Amino acid sequence: MESRLIGWDIGGAHLKAVLVNDLGDILSAKQTPCPLWQGLDRLDAELDLLTDTLGLTQYTHHAITMTGELADNFENREQGVMAITDLMARRFGTERVRVFAGHSGFLMADHVSKANVPEIASANWLASGLWGATRLEQALFIDIGSTTTDLLPIRAHRVENRGYTDHERMRYDELLYTGVARTPAMTVARRVPLNGGWINVMAEHFATTADVYRLTGELPEHADQLPAADNGAKNIAGSQKRLARLVGLDVDALSEGGWRQLAASLREHQLSAIHASIQLQLSRGLLDDSAPLLG
């Protein structure tokens, strides 16, 4: 029987899976919402769904990265890593489950211990970076997701990160907690231009960046898989209403074009912050002008 491998990225909000055959050909790629902070049973339920959808068998091998250990239903990252690893091993068998542990490679599930937690926790960025380094001599790796942005220089086929843990990477602007769907819009800008003046943005979770990019026309609907900030409609009208609350207005205070301009302003604030962090990485002098962006 053909050997298959599935790669799982177990996040705090989404579960991602890519199934490949023994030649490395991608057979299927899936992403499903998985609010892990609501309990491990949510992960179990989504694994049930994808196991059936992808036709996984007892012969399928499983490779795992994770960021879900940060979910606040876990006491700490150690508990999260061990709980997620145990669940996957219980479901699919310890002999067929490998967990990515950074430069230590993939560990068999029953070899994962507390000592490995710092290498395993939130290391999916490194898995991507190491793969990219096998293909390109130099590049700036950038991954903008629903919640975070990763930046990582690659030079001489080596990743050149200064931080490893989330805390360290945030210190060096290699990890930015800003993304295109789940980021609260209030965190993107302190104030925005409106009707010829400046208006401070309310520090309330009224809207997300999904609303911003929906109004700019750049958000594929499949990218917004979790409920809106108000649990309301995920359409143009719903996004306008949520952005209106952010600046203390009702939706009829501006035209559709006015709300689109507000969204464009928030977009520019977010992109400016990402651009500044890119400039910081480039200022290290590791890459020459021919280095491509890898994303």
Placement of each model-derived feature along the sequence:
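Conserved Rossmann-like nucleotide-cofactor binding loop
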Residues: 13, 147
